[in-house]
Amino acid sequence: MDTKARDVAMALAEDARQAEWENVSFTAEVFKGSFRWDLVHPFPAQSPEDRKIGDDYLVKVREVLERHVDPYQIDEQGEYPAAALEAMAAIGLFGMKIPQEYGGLGFSITNYARVLGMIGSYCSNTVTYLSAHQSIGVPQPLREFGTEEQKRKYLPRLARGEISAFALTEPDVGSDPARMGTVATPTEDGKAFILNGDKQWCTNVTDPKTTLIAVLARTPDKELPNGKKIPQISCFVVETAWPGVERVRRSTFMGLRGIANGSVTFKNVRVPAENMIGKPGEGLKIALATLNVGRLGLPAAAIGVGMAFVDDARWWITTRQQWGQPVGKHQAIA
């Protein structure tokens, strides 16, 4: 990378930094040479009231999984049966983190993680589907950065079972957003943006039930007092039914064959100005904050998968007989 490109990338990253952060950071203090044990111990315990909410809901989740979700069928066919989706929507699984005033369940992040753990222990495809929808999909950036009008327009739809996706990565752009090629050009009257570009590796985007996408795109550069310009990345809610939105390819994988991960193109898509989340240039900050929630959801699901592995191993070592006894009784395993 040449010096100019590096400077632009650094300026963009600094401009996207979450400057309004008010809490003391444990990691930042470590780098300063101060080990703030009080920031991590004692670990905050879930309140009895909140835990009961989670306990009661997990009973409903287990019933839906056992009655309506066949993980083997989903992985073999690569699709989610309509009956399974209807059952999940009926108990609010698509709106766990959406506030109650917008039709969701308003769960704490702890209960959300507990639910993902249970679903992950049962069906990895399903937990990926749900997590991508509300950990990094449209509900999360709207919760944190959306206007009241945006929340009332979209969150009830998403809580009822409409699916969303998140579009950041491009064929030539991954961790370097300064090179982003998707562009949102404002119209002369300022009432809309014209969106053009390509995105890939977007989970849920090729699912026909996905109606909304959080899209990151370049908007006009920000000019500094010294005359230099910084690329602006902004975030928009885009409806898949709008003219010019085309889902072009669904990716296939060795595992998780049920996830609808793929590519989407935008050709002269007219996006109303009121569909921008946050302010111009805040898109990268919004994306990073949104991805942080995804980084909590994924390990919660992975813990569930690990628990399922342990259960399977325990069953096997107690049922598999070798040399006159279960293999779990042999010294190498016991």
Where are these regions (language model features)?
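Short beta-alpha junctions and helix-cap segments that line functional grooves
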Residues: Y154, T169, R179-M180, Q200, ...
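Short Gly/Pro-enriched turn/cap motifs at secondary-structure boundaries
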Residues: D172-S175, N204-P208, N226-G227, F253-A260
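Amphipathic, small/basic residue-rich leader segments at the start of a protein or domain
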Residues: M1-H133, Q140-A159, I163-S164, S175, ...
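Glycine-rich beta->alpha junctions and the first turn(s) of the following alpha-helix
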Residues: E246-A334
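A short core secondary-structure module
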Residues: A192, N196-E246
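A gly/ser-rich beta-alpha-beta helix-loop segment of oxidoreductase catalytic cores
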Residues: I163-P186
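Short helix/loop capping segments that flank catalytic or ligand/cofactor-binding pockets
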Residues: G106-F107, S175-P177, T203-V205, E223-G227, ...
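Structural beta-strand/beta-sheet cores of well-ordered domains, especially the beta-sheet scaffolds
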Residues: E162-S164, M180-T182, K191, T211-V215, ...
